[in-house]
């Protein structure tokens, strides 16, 4: 396993499971240039698996999808591969978003602060993907309420 920090696995995990939004942003800013290579090299299959599962529950793959915590765009690539055509991504890391822009998978990409309301309208999306996002240090559980509020009534969150 390649680690983006030279100070060992324990310190790396402490950074991944950071306590503040600033800590999380700092981690992903540093990790952005090696993230795809590192997670790909470790067999990270979550984006492809989640995209396939999500597509099996959506009747219109042309409707807009919000990729909440889009990172470098790995999930956007996976969502496109299963047929989703209209993707919008938001993430806390401007460095990760810059890499996602290079992949050309999204109609729009925005950087946001998870401690304030996301830069999209409430009820704007039928489908929201937060692939590999919810967890301590990434998007803590209180973020759920903010994400769910963005869905149309009866919308799908994965």
Residue ranges and their predicted role:
Residues 1-33:
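N-terminal, positively charged/glycine-rich alpha-helical extensions of SAM-dependent methyltransferases
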């Amino acid at each position: 396993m390649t680690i983006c920090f030279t100070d060992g696995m324990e310190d790396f995990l402490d950074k991944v499971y950071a306590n503040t939004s600033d800590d999380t942003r700092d981690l992903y800013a540093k990790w952005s240039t090696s993230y795809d290579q590192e997670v790909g090299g470790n067999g990270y299959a979550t984006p492809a698996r989640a995209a396939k599962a999500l597509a099996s529950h959506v009747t219109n793959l042309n409707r807009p999808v919000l990729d909440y915590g889009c990172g470098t765009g790995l999930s956007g690539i996976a969502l496109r591969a299963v047929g989703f055509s209209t993707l919008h991504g938001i993430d806390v890391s401007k460095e990760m978003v810059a890499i996602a822009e290079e992949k050309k998978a999204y109609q729009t990409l925005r950087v946001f602060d998870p401690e304030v309301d996301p830069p999209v309208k409430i009820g704007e999306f039928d489908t929201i993907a937060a692939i590999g996002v919810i967890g301590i240090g990434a998007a803590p559980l209180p973020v759920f309420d903010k994400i769910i509020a963005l869905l149309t009534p009866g919308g799908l969150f994965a």
